[in-house]
């Protein structure tokens, strides 16, 4: 059986403050708290910011979380609602794993 995950990619939105790093952006603490709910519910496997200067990051849900649930959760993110971040959900086929 194929392991398909619906990965959330974040990038700076229209309310992103130029010259500020990710953790200085408005709403990022609430963004982290939002995804911590999924981590605590064991629905999030990995997540974090990109380390380049472009900002943004990604979240990798555990196997079995539907595209609809991932899309809904991503749209409820306070940083997405405020425009600090944009979220894109993309399907990802795990081709290699331990």
Show which residues each predicted segment covers:
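Conserved, structured core segments of small domains
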Residues: 1-98
